[in-house]
Regions:
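Flexible "arm" and connector segments at domain edges
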Residues: 1-123
Length: 123
């Protein structure tokens, strides 16, 4: 079986996705923002399951694709309702990153955000 598809531009995706936004809440940002937060949480939950179950979690790739699709849909709705173009947001990638400093490649831990005297009292 061959899946046939036509690649979409960011703007084409946004235009098609917005035709499925059926909420009649006057264009409020509340619903799509809550949806974006919820779907991002669902994506993080899939990552958690993969870390916990490792190789035994066979549905990971499909679940991540599904959740990322939902995140993208809600991001599109938030952008549109906020008067922004998804193309403009995606175009932000072309800006320079000279203002970003490279962080050291160290493991993230709860202790890394605490002053040493606080961490030593928790040991």
């Amino acid at each position: 079986m061959t899946d046939e598809f036509s690649p979409l531009s960011v703007q084409d995706y946004a235009s098609q996705a917005l035709t499925t936004d059926q909420r009649s809440d006057g264009g409020s940002l509340a619903f799509p923002l809550l949806g974006l937060f919820g779907e991002t949480g669902s994506l993080l939950s899939e990552v958690k399951k993969k870390q916990r179950d490792r190789a035994s979690y066979l549905g990971y790739a499909a679940a991540v694709v599904d959740e990322l699709g939902d995140v993208l849909w809600y991001l599109t709705a938030v952008a549109a309702r906020g008067g922004l173009s998804l193309s403009d947001i995606a175009g932000n990638l072309s800006r320079g990153y000279s203002d970003w400093q490279r962080a050291p490649d160290t493991a993230l831990s709860f202790a890394s955000g605490l002053p040493p005297e606080k961490w030593s009292s928790l040991k």
